[in-house]
């Protein structure tokens, strides 16, 4: 037994390091609120709705229908890249709100106090070393169209209570997206699920619980403005994934669709299913146990008949398969014999032909001697046949290639004809338009000077319009750049705020259940910043409070904690010295305890020997009683006349048994008394040892 001091933190257990902060500290639900609205003009052209909800086609403008309306297209990965690229921990805190996820040691802040020894290296695998790449083509129009169609058809089939318009699945508002998401989650997870005040936090938690593979593409900014052009493809793919889960859940119990062998009755499983006998036995035991537990029956004839029927059916199937296999083997053998007979006949014919050629062998020998390239007629015909078949196959492949070329040429010709027809129609339209314009000009009766002046004004207006377009483009680009800078700053601030909340929870500044230092108890360390506020004075006021009040209070707390840690370190050194002294005294007492344990073991062995002797005597007595009862039974069966003598002998035997049992009880009492005395002696020895240890400890404390 090792009495050396051990650390309170176990090195074993879970291989995943657990954070020392509460789950609410990792991502506090800060009231960032909706972000500011962009003043940049829209550069995105409206597109035609591809949903088949209405017969008419409407132009759905791509804009932000939520609180923050970003009018400039952006990349979906910018947010996550900025969060992970600006700092090492940005991707962790920004992507896992309110989750008790283990934070790697590489992103934790190192202590301001020096340590005497380095801690052991963590053996946990790097969870954040590799990023999952979504293989789905989220930006593909065809993929988006299929997702919209799938979501729309499912919502209609399950009677979605709210109306579906043409813009619902092309550029929805935040309210529409939240309604669809809540409807799918309530249908899939829990119909009575409770939703908190922060829809974004609940959504991220639910998707993480459902193990959504594209969690990196779902952020709070995207959930706040789901209808934005840079956010909607990812949100649409996520809704399509939820719809597929709902469909799979609806078909979970359909025997025509599922293929899970655990949900199929054992009698319908194939014979080659592994552990079929165990499955039949398990079903039989489960069915009969439920009947027995309910008290319905003690015998299970119906279940036994079903089990016998299942085994009989399996045996009949095996027998039928064996017979069919035998028949197939017999038929195959007969066919093989017939084939061999035909082959023999063919070889016999060839032998006859060779015999005929041997009759003409002198002539053949002279020809072959004169011409080395001479071949027998049969061999020559076979070579010619092989060559002709090869030419035939080549010609067929050539015809196929030419047919494919003809089809391609026909398609090209049809496309050219269509282009020619469209060009002719356009030319006719332009000619008619030119004639109409010439008639209008002729009707106006304009002079050449007026025409020249109008052309000059048109050129000047065109140049002015082009200049305005260039200025608008430059202003839009500048607004886009500024908006990207603001977005990056907001994301970086969100990550820094998360770090601040986590560290504040660790030292107890935000957890009011802990003891807050007296110097910092009157300071509110909670940061509630609304970056989406219209008035910038509120944000500036929070910044002033951060620099003036909170920063000074944190410096004071740091100095106080440093002094406290220094005092605790000195106290720890003193306690370690005292602990070493006590350890030496305990080692001496351990030797005495070991001697007492040896004595106790000897006493236990003696008690066990006595118990074994008593058990052997009891077994002998039981054997005698059994033998006597057997003799009594035989005597009763042999003759009725010996009943009286047998009863008298039985009475005498019972009296002897009672005396023997009485003696056994007395002996047991004596043994128990001796064991009790030994136990009392052991208890007294332990009490004496404990009192000695207490006196030694008191003496050590006084010294």
Swiss-Prot record:
The keyword Cell cycle applies. Keywords: Cell cycle, Cell division, Centromere, Chromosome, Coiled coil, Kinetochore, Mitosis, Nucleus. Residues 1-132 are annotated as: Disordered. Residues 326-358, 407-479, 573-616 form a coiled coil. GO terms for cellular component: Ndc80 complex; nucleus. Residues 9-24 have a biased composition (Low complexity). Its main location: nucleus. It is found in: Nucleus; Chromosome, Centromere, Kinetochore. Gene3D superfamilies: 1.10.287.1490, Ncd80 complex, Ncd80 subunit. GO terms for biological process: cell division; mitotic sister chromatid biorientation. Residues 39-60, 108-121 have a biased composition (Polar residues). One of its GO terms (molecular function) is microtubule binding. Acts as a component of the essential kinetochore-associated NDC80 complex, which is required for chromosome segregation and spindle checkpoint activity. Belongs to the NDC80/HEC1 family. Component of the NDC80 complex, which consists of at least NDC80, NUF2 and SPC25. This is Probable kinetochore protein NDC80. It comes from Cryptococcus neoformans var. neoformans serotype D (strain B-3501A). The gene is NDC80.
């Amino acid at each position: 037994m090792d009495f050396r001091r051990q650390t309170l933190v176990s090195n074993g257990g879970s291989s995943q390091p657990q954070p020392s902060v509460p789950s609410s500290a990792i991502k506090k639900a800060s009231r960032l609120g909706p972000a500011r609205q962009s003043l940049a003009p829209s550069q995105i052209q409206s597109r035609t709705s591809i949903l088949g909800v209405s017969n008419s086609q409407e132009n759905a403008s791509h804009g932000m229908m939520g609180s923050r309306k970003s009018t400039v297209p952006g990349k979906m990965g910018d947010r996550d890249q900025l969060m992970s690229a600006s700092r090492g921990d940005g991707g962790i805190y920004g992507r896992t709100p309110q989750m008790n996820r283990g934070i790697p040691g590489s992103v934790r802040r190192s202590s301001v106090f020096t340590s005497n020894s380095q801690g052991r290296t963590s053996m946990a695998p790097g969870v954040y070393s590799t990023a999952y790449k979504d293989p789905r083509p989220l930006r593909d129009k065809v993929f988006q169209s299929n997702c919209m169609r799938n979501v729309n058809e499912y919502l209609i089939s399950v009677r979605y209570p709210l109306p579906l318009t043409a813009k619902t699945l092309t550029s929805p508002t935040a309210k529409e997206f939240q309604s669809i998401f809540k409807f799918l989650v309530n249908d899939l997870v829990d119909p009575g699920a409770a939703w908190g005040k922060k829809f974004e936090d609940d959504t991220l938690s639910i998707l993480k619980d459902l193990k959504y593979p594209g969690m990196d593409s779902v952020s709070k900014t995207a959930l706040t403005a789901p209808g934005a052009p840079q956010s909607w493809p990812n949100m649409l793919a996520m809704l399509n994934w939820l719809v597929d889960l709902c469909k799979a859940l609806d078909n979970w119990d359909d025997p025509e669709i599922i293929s899970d062998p655990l949900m199929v009755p054992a009698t319908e499983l194939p014979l080659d299913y592994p552990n079929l006998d165990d499955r039949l036995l398990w079903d039989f035991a489960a069915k009969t146990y439920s009947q027995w537990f309910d008290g319905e029956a003690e015998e299970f004839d119906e279940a036994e008949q079903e089990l016998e029927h299942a085994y009989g059916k399996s045996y009949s199937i095996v027998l039928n398969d064996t017979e069919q296999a035998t028949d197939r083997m017999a038929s195959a053998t007969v066919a093989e014999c017939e084939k061999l007979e035909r082959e023999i006949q063919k070889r016999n014919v060839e032998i006859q032909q060779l015999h005929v050629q041997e009759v003409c062998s002198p002539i053949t020998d002279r020809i072959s001697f004169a011409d080395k390239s001479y071949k027998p007629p049969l061999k020559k015909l076979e070579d010619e046949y092989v060559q002709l078949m090869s030419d035939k196959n080549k010609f067929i492949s050539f015809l196929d290639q030419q047919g494919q070329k003809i089809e391609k040429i026909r398609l090209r010709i049809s496309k050219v004809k269509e282009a020619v027809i469209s060009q002719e129609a356009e030319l006719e339209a332009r000619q008619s338009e030119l004639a109409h314009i010439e008639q209008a000009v002729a009707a106006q009766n304009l002079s050449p000077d007026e025409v020249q002046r109008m052309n000059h004004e048109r050129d000047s207006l065109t140049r002015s319009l082009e200049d305005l377009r260039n200025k608008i483009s430059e202003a839009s680009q500048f607004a886009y750049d500024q908006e990207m800078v603001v977005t990056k700053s907001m994301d970086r601030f969100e990550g820094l705020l998360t770090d601040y909340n986590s560290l504040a929870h660790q030292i107890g500044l935000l957890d009011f259940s802990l003891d807050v230092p007296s110097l910092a108890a009157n300071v509110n360390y909670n940061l509630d910043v609304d970056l989406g506020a219209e008035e910038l004075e509120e944000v500036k006021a929070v910044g002033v409070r951060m620099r003036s009040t909170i920063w000074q209070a944190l410096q004071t707390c740091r100095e106080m904690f440093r002094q406290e840690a220094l005092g605790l370190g000195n106290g720890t050194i003193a306690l370690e010295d005292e602990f070493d002294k006590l350890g030496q005294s305990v080692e001496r007492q351990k030797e005495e305890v070991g001697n007492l344990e040896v004595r106790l073991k000897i006493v236990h062995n003696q008690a066990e020997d006595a118990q074994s002797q008593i058990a052997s005597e009891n077994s002998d007595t039981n054997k005698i009683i059994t033998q006597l009862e057997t003799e009594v039974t035989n005597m009763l069966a042999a003759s009725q006349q010996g009943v009286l003598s047998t009863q008298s002998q039985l009475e005498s035997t019972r009296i002897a048994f009672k005396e023997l049992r009485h003696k056994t009880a007395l002996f047991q009492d004596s043994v128990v008394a001796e064991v009790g005395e030994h136990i009392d002696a052991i208890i007294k020895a332990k009490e004496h040892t404990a009192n000695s240890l207490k006196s030694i400890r008191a003496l050590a404390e006084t010294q």
